[in-house]
């Protein structure tokens, strides 16, 4: 999956350098500080804000531009707090454009609610951040390489100071 993805997205040099995100190991929140791969990168508020900025994607300028976009599916994932969740009710389907835009749909079968998702990948760091179009204050983030695996860690920022860890589990 990784090799196909890296040849699809333009303007990247990822082919041999996948970056895996592992919250608690490669990305660590220590008090009000965020450390990535051993380097202090930001305060927790700044890190959440940078995810929000990455997720804030402008819609296509025209219908023609939207129709011309090329998309590659990243997969359909159960959203859970536990790998052993046998009956997840929340599902996320994601795709990526050649330009690194993330698009998709969230569906909660317990409430029959669906919401559009939009966001982007940082082509330098491979960080992926996306948000609900209808609730842009909720920001989700993971690593692009993680989205090519069977499960991917996910941080959900409910506000700059409130976040929770989730897991995206690939559905077959």
How should each PLM-predicted stretch be described?
Residues 94-102, 124-125, 145-151, 172:
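Short, solvent-exposed coil/turn segments at beta-strand boundaries
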Residues 1-60:
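Low-complexity segments
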Residues 108-147:
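Contiguous, well-ordered beta-strand patches that form the walls/edges
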Residues 87-120:
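N-terminal glycine/threonine-rich, aromatic-flanked beta-hairpin/loop signature
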Residues 3, 96-97, 108, 122, ...:
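Acidic/polar residues at beta-strand termini and the immediately following turn/coil
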Residues 78-82, 103-108, 129-133, 154-158:
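Short beta-strand segments that buttress and anchor functional surface loops
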Residues 60-88, 151-158, 162-171:
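Tryptophan-anchored aromatic micro-motifs
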């Amino acid at each position: 999956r990784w090799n196909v993805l890296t040849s699809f997205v333009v303007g990247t040099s990822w082919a041999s350098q996948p970056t895996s995100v592992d919250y608690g190991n490669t990305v660590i929140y220590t008090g009000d500080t965020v450390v990535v791969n051993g380097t202090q990168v930001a305060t927790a508020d700044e890190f959440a804000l940078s995810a929000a900025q990455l997720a804030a994607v402008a819609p296509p300028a025209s219908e023609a531009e939207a129709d011309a976009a090329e998309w590659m599916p990243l997969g359909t994932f159960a959203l859970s707090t536990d790998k052993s969740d046998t009956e997840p009710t929340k599902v996320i389907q994601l795709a990526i454009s050649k330009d690194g835009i993330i698009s998709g749909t969230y569906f909660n079968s317990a409430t029959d609610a669906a919401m559009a998702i939009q966001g982007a990948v940082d082509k330098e760091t491979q960080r992926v951040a996306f948000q609900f179009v209808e609730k842009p204050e909720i920001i989700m983030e993971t690593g692009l390489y993680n989205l090519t695996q069977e499960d991917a860690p996910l941080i959900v920022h409910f506000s700059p100071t409130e976040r929770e860890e989730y897991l995206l589990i690939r559905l077959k």
